[in-house]
């Protein structure tokens, strides 16, 4: 799942999961509801609660740092200035019988973007160079790449490494070509990195 526009849509997703989720499915949830320390205006507490319930049913989730704070109740002000160990500890608090991996995305530290991959064995950090601000759609591309690779049989950490390499090239090219950030990134020539 990704962005959910209404309570009605969330309930349809829950009904689908009740019918089809089993040990042979991989449920990847990108709990889109917040960024840069702020919950999106269209999300009320009930919508945030619905996304949190979905995340708890997933096998893998990919919250950004703000979404991790919403899911865990941690302070964004504190966690955004913390090191990866503290972020991994917060992410690990979400792990349960179903949720086996939490990938915290897009953590900006100086000239680097970190992604923390936490599972029951611990955590790893996957980093890339930061190129200016953010481009529209990169979170969606990341989630799609990791979801596709894990369904194909890749471990979540390996899938994250490939997705980060894929996106780093696309973002670098878009930055160097002065692509309007609202138009997304030039990713097509990097699709081979996902094979």
Task: List PLM regions with ranges.
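Glycine-rich beta-alpha junction loops
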Residues: 3-5, 33-35, 67, 106-110, ...
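Glycine/small-residue-rich loop that forms an oxyanion/phosphate-binding "nest" at active or ligand-binding sites
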Residues: 1-53
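Short, small-residue alpha-helix embedded
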Residues: 69-70, 132-156
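Structural signal for hydrophobic packing residues in well-ordered secondary-structure cores
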Residues: 17, 21, 58, 98, ...
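Charged C-terminal helix
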Residues: 157-195
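Gly/Ser/Thr-rich beta-alpha loop segments that engage phosphate groups in nucleotides
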Residues: 4, 108, 139-141, 145, ...
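Hydrophobic residues at beta-strand termini and immediately following loops
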Residues: 126
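Conserved phosphate/ATP/ADP-binding segment of small-molecule kinases
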Residues: 41-123, 157
